Amino acid sequence: MSNITKKSLIAAGILTALIAASAATAADVPAGVQLADKQTLVRNNGSEVQSLDPHKIEGVPESNVSRDLFEGLLISDVEGHPSPGVAEKWENKDFKVWTFHLRENAKWSDGTPVTAHDFVYSWQRLADPNTASPYASYLQYGHIANIDDIIAGKKPATDLGVKALDDHTFEVTLSEPVPYFYKLLVHPSVSPVPKSAVEKFGDKWTQPANIVTNGAYKLKNWVVNERIVLERNPQYWDNAKTVINQVTYLPISSEVTDVNRYRSGEIDMTYNNMPIELFQKLKKEIPNEVRVDPYLCTYYYEINNQKAPFNDVRVRTALKLALDRDIIVNKVKNQGDLPAYSYTPPYTDGAKLVEPEWFKWSQQKRNEEAKKLLAEAGFTADKPLTFDLLYNTSDLHKKLAIAVASIWKKNLGVNVNLENQEWKTFLDTRHQGTFDVARAGWCADYNEPTSFLNTMLSDSSNNTAHYKSPAFDKLIADTLKVADDTQRSELYAKAEQQLDKDSAIVPVYYYVNARLVKPWVGGYTGKDPLDNIYVKNLYIIKH
């Protein structure tokens, strides 16, 4: 939205969010395209999901499935813009009180209506410490009234600033104005969950026989570590525009296996990590099937800021400086990613970042400064720094970890032991803080700097670097005290500078989204930098 439009609406006291003239996106099949008789899609999802409960998930694999099973107030269109989901329209007063008008024909897969009461229950459940959601802090990012006290256990979840004005009107009250609040509502964690099923079946409510969904698809079959199969939900409000009848998600963690099964015809769409050793070959052999698109993600190494010796900023800074990003990006990976100097990608909406001075240095100068800092911290050739580098099971992450360990050894003289864990164990280890340095990646939940920066707040449930900085926390809090976009961007830049000063993480590269897509998969655009793919927008062309 332009500043002119925004200012005029602020003057009126009400901002009506960007709403498409038509209903939310669905499969748009061009005239003349012949559809296949069999409308089924097979996607690789990168790993076994952590859960199918929207309040128990935090990774990309889980979000991919959740988008098809559950629909929140808003969804993304094919270019990544927030669009109507269960809410067909909404407005706000001074960016602080937001009112969402729900579709009267929105239903659960059991035929019961989706109501504002479902959202009240679901958001209270997400906030409740007893749920132990890894995304409880997401409601803090939206500054919903009373969320801080609820997470701290000082108030009950029922005090959350949400209410049902009637069955189809949902009101959210924030503790302070948040102009971009509506952007947060695309994320799966704020989708509704079915109260009756949750209360009846407890932790088993997501099993195929028990689950009730409100998205375009429902769960047909789930064989752990083998496949998740979804089928069309005939109760979905926009089911008439859905084309694909069944989608299968495979938990293949090996990028090479992913490509091999794609080329054998078993998979229609690979995961968004391409094998390093096959990428250039694939570009030559099947160029029309190799998709390389923008992706709002940062690949980095997460340092345990609370664990000695990594609680010494000199050690963290030495690791940051001595990593040769050009080798990683241009020689090891070579897929078009960009060397990173920050946590927030500089092309994020509202980001006006300043390159740090060290990023302008030669690698030789960075290495010299890194060795000096490490020596000051007490580590020398006779007493080298030795630590474990943790990564989740993946061909790509393993190759990068090997390369990074070698670079740090050469440039800094440190000894790195590599350790890998399966996805769910890996996430638990990081949350518990029982690691030295870990491979990490963050992909934006919405296109705004706080989608990255909020995760580094001292009290964030996403803060697995265990970084604590009152100065950083204050800068983020101050962003909500300014109405001017330019001033807000300046504060975001200062927050990034604080992260850099503290060397909270080791940024490696800003991602591109590289995957293989069969030519008969219609509706895939690759234009959404958040990579929010909804299978209801896709279709299979006759081939």
UniProtKB/Swiss-Prot annotation:
GO terms for biological process: peptide transport; protein transport. It comes from the Bacteria. Gene3D superfamilies: Dipeptide-binding Protein, Domain 1, Dipeptide-binding Protein, Domain 3, Periplasmic binding protein-like II. Transmembrane segments: none annotated. Keywords: Disulfide bond, Peptide transport, Periplasm, Protein transport, Signal, Transport. Residues 1-26 form the signal peptide. GO terms for cellular component: ATP-binding cassette (ABC) transporter complex; outer membrane-bounded periplasmic space. It is found in: Periplasm. It holds the Pfam family SBP_bac_5. Disruption phenotype: Mutant cannot take up cell wall peptides. Induction: Part of the opp operon, which is constitutively expressed. SUPFAM superfamilies: Periplasmic binding protein-like II (SSF53850). Disulfide bonds join 297-443. GO terms for molecular function: peptide transmembrane transporter activity. InterPro entries: Peptide/Ni-bd (IPR030678), SBP_5 (IPR039424), SBP_5_CS (IPR023765), SBP_5_dom (IPR000914). Accommodates the ligand side chains in large hydrated pockets which impose little specificity on binding. Tight binding is achieved by utilising the hydrogen-bonding potential of the main chain of the ligand. Part of the ABC transporter complex OppABCDF involved in the uptake of oligopeptides, including the cell wall murein tripeptide L-alanyl-gamma-D-glutamyl-meso-diaminopimelate. Plays an important nutritional role and is involved in the recycling of cell wall peptides. Binds peptides containing from two to five amino acid residues regardless of their sequence. Also binds cell wall peptides, such as L-alanyl-gamma-D-glutamyl-meso-diaminopimelate. The complex is composed of two ATP-binding proteins (OppD and OppF), two transmembrane proteins (OppB and OppC) and a solute-binding protein (OppA). Belongs to the bacterial solute-binding protein 5 family. Isothermal titration calorimetric measurements of the binding of lysine-containing peptides of different lengths to OppA show that the dipeptide Lys-Lys is bound with 60-fold lower affinity than related tri- and tetrapeptides (Lys-Lys-Lys and Lys-Lys-Lys-Ala, respectively). This is Periplasmic oligopeptide-binding protein OppA. It comes from Salmonella typhimurium (strain LT2 / SGSC1412 / ATCC 700720). The lineage of its organism: Bacteria, Pseudomonadati, Pseudomonadota, Gammaproteobacteria, Enterobacterales. The gene is oppA.
